[in-house]
Amino acid sequence: MDLIKHYINGEDIEGGSRQGDVYNPAIGEVISKVTLGDLELVNNAIESSKKVLEKWRYTTPAKRASIMFNYKKLLEDNSARIAEMVSKEHGKTIEDAKGSLQRGIEVVEYACGIPNLLKGEYSNQVGSGIDTFSMKQELGICAGITPFNFPVMIPLWMFPLATACGNAFILKPSERDPSSSIELVRLFEEAGAPPGLVNVVNGDKEVVDALIEHREVPVSYTHLRAHETD
């Protein structure tokens, strides 16, 4: 049976002592196993991203935009294959999976305009002898915790814009359908992104807690309102 591993620094990593089942909902059978990460693996992924970030944050917006254009083309060229991966692990129809992927690609297209989006502002004489200006700077390492129901759309809402703005990214997809999310990152590297800029850590609550509690990592996630007070 296939084992779905973490994807860190451009490599498949098996880290973590536990595994979970990945089902094909159409037949109700386990089709693969997924490695579940732990605190140590999360910290290793963050350290990997730190090393890449030191160079990436100084990469010009024009160069980042070039990678985004390449990435958009790769996503479009591989849309049928990605949709099949989503359908196999999630249960969406192929057409529904293609539709959700397209909504993600639209965000990548928006990220292609990052040189213009990152422009600051300057105002003359806002007060007597006072001029003001603003600069947009990266946050550093960001993380995204994404849900089962949209394994490609929501990751594409997160990491392309985050990296286009000069950040590195840790992606924690749902452990129930992780394959298509990992494939998004493989294609991102094929488009020209450096290995380790986006790392994928599979896992459950242990990984989620490690990311949320890490002081250096701002987290974006999709959740139920009740989770806000859990």
Name the predicted role of every residue range.
Residues P160, P218-Y221:
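Periplasmic-binding protein-like
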Residues E121-P195:
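Conserved small-residue-rich beta-alpha loop and adjacent elements
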Residues D131-T132, V200-P218:
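A structured beta-alpha segment of the ubiquitous adenosine-cofactor-binding alpha/beta core
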Residues M1-K33, S66, G120-T146:
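Terminal low-complexity tails and localization/encapsulation signals of metabolic enzymes
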Residues G28-L118:
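Glycine-rich loop-to-alpha-helix module at the N-terminal edge of alpha/beta enzyme cores
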